[in-house]
């Protein structure tokens, strides 16, 4: 009986701890916004790379979420496909900026990161 109880507690703690690792959409959006500000103020490639890496992870995680405006839509709906496509675009732009940062081109990476704002604004207008 005691071993069963311990096993149940162990499994339930794993389930609850793994659920806390997945950030919600709002947290991911905040991560994207905060790190975009870091990129704008950065003065070295390491800062830019770190911020872009965090942004990439947040964008990929956010892509799996459903925005409140689309909660009544099926995952295969055109709107949800477009929502996810927006993150594909964003991740591509992040990758382009990351490539520049890896080459030590800080100013160019910052300029490339400016495109993220255009994508953000377009998709916020649709789904926020």
From Swiss-Prot:
Signal sequence extent: 1-22
Comp. bias intervals (Basic and acidic residues): 69-82
Keywords recorded for this protein, A-Z: Electron transport, Heme, Iron, Metal-binding, Periplasm, Signal, Transport
Subcellular location as annotated: Periplasm
Recorded GO CC terms: periplasmic space
Co-factor binding details: Binds 1 heme b (iron(II)-protoporphyrin IX) group per molecule.
Region of interest: Disordered: 60-82
Keyword field contains Glycoprotein: no
Known cofactor(s): heme b
GO process terms (BP): electron transport chain
Binding, heme b: 29, 124
GO molecular function: electron transfer activity; heme binding; iron ion binding
UniProt keyword annotation of Heme present: yes
The protein's role, per its UniProt record: Electron-transport protein of unknown function.
Family stated for the protein in its record: Belongs to the cytochrome b562 family.
Subunit-structure text: Monomer.
Name of the protein: Soluble cytochrome b562
Native species: Escherichia coli
Gene that encodes it: cybC
């Amino acid at each position: 009986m005691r071993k069963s109880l311990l096993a149940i507690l162990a499994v339930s703690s794993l389930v609850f701890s793994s659920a806390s690792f997945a950030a919600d959409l709002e947290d991911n959006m905040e991560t994207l916004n905060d790190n975009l500000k870091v990129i704008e103020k950065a003065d070295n490639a390491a800062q830019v790379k770190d911020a872009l890496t965090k942004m990439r992870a947040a964008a990929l995680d956010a892509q799996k979420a459903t925005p409140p405006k689309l909660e009544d839509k099926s995952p295969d709906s055109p709107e949800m496909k477009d929502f996810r496509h927006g993150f594909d675009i964003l991740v591509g732009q992040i990758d382009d900026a990351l490539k520049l940062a890896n080459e030590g081109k800080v100013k160019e990476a910052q300029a490339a990161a400016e495109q993220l704002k255009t994508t953000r604004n377009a998709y916020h207008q649709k789904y926020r």
